[in-house]
Every structure is written in structure tokens, then in C-alpha cells.
Amino acid sequence: FLTAFLVTIFFMWQGNVGFSLWDEGFLWYGAQRVLQGEIPIRDFQSYEPGRYYWAATFMYLFGDNGIMALRVSVAIFQAIGVFVGLFLICSGAKRQNIFYILLSAIILMLWMYPRHKFYDISISILCIGSLYFLIHNPTARRYFFSGLVVGLAALFGRNHGLYGIIGSLTTMVWLSIKREPSHTLGSARGFFLWSAGVITGFMP
């Protein structure tokens, strides 16, 4: 609820302010081309296709290909990143303090600006969240889920995919070294499941 409230307030405050022709305009143009049935990279110059399909999906659902519909789609992605970020912060906090959580949420949102950075920062937070999820309890499902997040991250940016792979491999090595008796899943099987998740996430 806090995430949705703050993202809505920030959107009402800044949602109709400013326009970056190169960054935001490039994304807007790409999303419109996707709505016309074109494919990013193949049919028009673009970054990785994930962000265009995300924006185009919501623009289609809204029945609007305007700039405000694009910004709403980006704000929704921002909300996901802020929610996961707050979850990680709260998980690491010894005491749940509403003022601390509120301050953390505001800092997270300010850190994400300008608007075209929402994707990149949110994806980084999601990758960190998936690794926390894996470290907390390295089960088969969590290995696969961690790989799935890396694969999806690569759809939004090859650099994010690369960072996710490096972070995941480092985490799996650490889990292998610090393996506890309760962790019955072998390293090889965990790597296989993670790899399957990466392929599945990147497949679209």
C-alpha cells in the first residue's frame, strides 16, 4: 500500500512535467512501433525489446498510445522496484519503524530519477531481490526463479543480464562453499535449474 501511495503521489507531482526527446522519446517511439506489429531491433533501431513490450502492453490495455500512458506503464514498473527494495530493507531491519521505512521509500524513489532510469534501477533491485530470495532458502524453485529473473533482466538490457549472471554465479559459489546440512540440493543441480530459468526468462 505504501509503495502504491508514494508512486501515485510522485506521479501526480511529476507525471506531466518535462520531456526528454532522446531518452523518453526513443522509448515512446519504440512502444508505438510495437503497437503497430513491428519487432524491436529487427524492424527499428532500439535497445533490448523488454521495455518496449512492457510499455506497449499497458498502452494497448489503456487504449492510448500517448506519452501519459507510457509514463503510467513506467511508473508501474517503478512501483515493482520500490516494493522489492522496501521488502529487502524491511527484511534486514531488526525493528520495523514506519518513519525509517517511509524515508527509505522516498530515497529509493528519488534515486530512480530521472524517469527513463526507472527500468534500469528497478531491474537491478529485482536481481538483488532474487539473489536474497535464493540465499535465504536455496531450494530448487528458488534456483529456477533466480535464473528466470536474470533471463528477464537480459530482455530489458544485456548489461543487466551480464551483471545478473556474474552476481548469480558468485552467489552459487558462495552457497556451495557455505553449504549447510539443511541444504540438500546439490550445486550441479542448482546450476542446471538456474540455467533453465535463464533460458526460460530470455526465451520471449
PLM segments and residue spans:
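Hydrophobic alpha-helical membrane-interfacial segments at the cytosolic entry of transmembrane helices
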Residues: 1-7, 183-204
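Extracytoplasmic catalytic/substrate-binding loops of multi-pass membrane glycan-assembly enzymes
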Residues: 15-30, 41-57, 64-68
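Hydrophobic core segments of transmembrane alpha-helices in multi-pass, intramembrane catalytic enzymes
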Residues: 27, 78-82, 120-132, 145, ...
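Transmembrane-helix motifs of polytopic, lipid-linked glycan transferases
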Residues: 72-95, 133
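Membrane-interface alpha helices of multi-pass inner-membrane proteins
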Residues: 108-109, 143-158, 164-169, 198-201
